[in-house]
Amino acid sequence: MKPLRFAVTPGEPAGIGPDLCLLLAADAQPHPLIAITSRDLLAERATQLGLAVSLLPVAPGQWPDLPAPAGSLYVWDTPLAAPVVPGQLDKANAAFVLETLTRAGQGCLDGHFAGMITAPVHKGVINESGIAFSGHTEFLAELTRTAQVVMMLATRGLRVALVTTHLPLRDVADAITAERVERVTRILHADMRDKFGIANPRILVCGLNPHAGEGGHLGREEIDIIEPTLARLRTEGMDLRGPLPADTLFTPKYLEHCDAVLAMYHDQGLPVLKYKGFGAAVNVTLGLPIIRTSVDHGTALDLAGTGKVDTGSLRVALETAYQMAENRP
């Protein structure tokens, strides 16, 4: 059987991404895991952290078939443009960050990697360098030529996908269209089936308005857009429940019988998930032809090089990527 290799990108070199990768090396992984970053950066950070990690070089055409031993980490060396000081951003390294993402994403497309796991980048410093960059998700959508992707956050026991993501609240209602709801629901359903191995996923769908519109008295999006769209998709055999009031849906009675929740907007679904899985949640990009998971936290510049970082989110991101790859047909 072909080995399942995975790429991990540490993201912003002055942040905690390199620290997280080094800390993960303490434990043997079930699959070969390759850090795409500067070997010198990892060596310097390991010294700063007082960690003894063996950095094993790999390159295209020399991919490992077996996991690295505990205390070791495979590294595909990617050169920095400028030296790195933990906690100090340098726009000179912006292109380096994007090169690591390109190598990981293209490696997935070419079949070298079964999936990629990303640590946080700093969008601001990349844009300050003169490179337009709105985030991992958009970057990978462009790289893979994917028209529509879906943001889903997950923790143990709960998955929440979003119809809209980073929009001001005043713009959300206008963005809830039948076309968008259908497109996002189809992607969520397909990836639950094909990447998570759930033959007939049960999806709970939030309404947009309080009390799911209260029969049209508190808004008509449920009546005019969401319910008709769900009804059409149910005729294809999709198990869709809703639209339900969010304050009803996010209760044990409902959640224990669902595989995923579809929320209409960012702050409708994610506060519940982050409360349930604080420090142990993962961001999954659905709709891509590749597997991509990510931590759910930022670069934490103030913690870089201190040894005071929590690997919980990265471990869940790894577990999720492994699970998705193992479930793919």
UniProtKB/Swiss-Prot annotation:
Organism superkingdom: Bacteria
Keywords: Cobalt, Cytoplasm, Magnesium, Metal-binding, NAD, NADP, Oxidoreductase, Pyridoxine biosynthesis, Zinc
Major localization class: cytoplasm
Gene3D superfamilies per record: Isopropylmalate Dehydrogenase
Pathway, per record: Cofactor biosynthesis; pyridoxine 5'-phosphate biosynthesis; pyridoxine 5'-phosphate from D-erythrose 4-phosphate: step 4/5
Keyword check for Transferase: no
One of the GO biological process terms: pyridoxine biosynthetic process
CC cofactor: Zn(2+); Mg(2+); Co(2+)
Binding site for substrate: 136-137, 274, 283, 292
Subcellular location per the Swiss-Prot or TrEMBL entry: Cytoplasm
Protein's UniProt keywords contain Membrane: no
Enzyme Commission number(s) of this protein: 1.1.1.262
Catalytic activity: 4-(phosphooxy)-L-threonine + NAD(+) = 3-amino-2-oxopropyl phosphate + CO2 + NADH
GO MF entries: 4-hydroxythreonine-4-phosphate dehydrogenase activity; cobalt ion binding; magnesium ion binding; NAD binding; zinc ion binding
UniProt: a divalent metal cation binding residues: 166, 211, 266
Manner of cofactor binding, per the entry note: Binds 1 divalent metal cation per subunit. Can use ions such as Zn(2+), Mg(2+) or Co(2+).
Function, as annotated: Catalyzes the NAD(P)-dependent oxidation of 4-(phosphooxy)-L-threonine (HTP) into 2-amino-3-oxo-4-(phosphooxy)butyric acid which spontaneously decarboxylates to form 3-amino-2-oxopropyl phosphate (AHAP).
Family: Belongs to the PdxA family.
Subunit structure: Homodimer.
Miscellaneous remark of the record: The active site is located at the dimer interface.
HAMAP family: PdxA
Protein name per its UniProtKB record: 4-hydroxythreonine-4-phosphate dehydrogenase
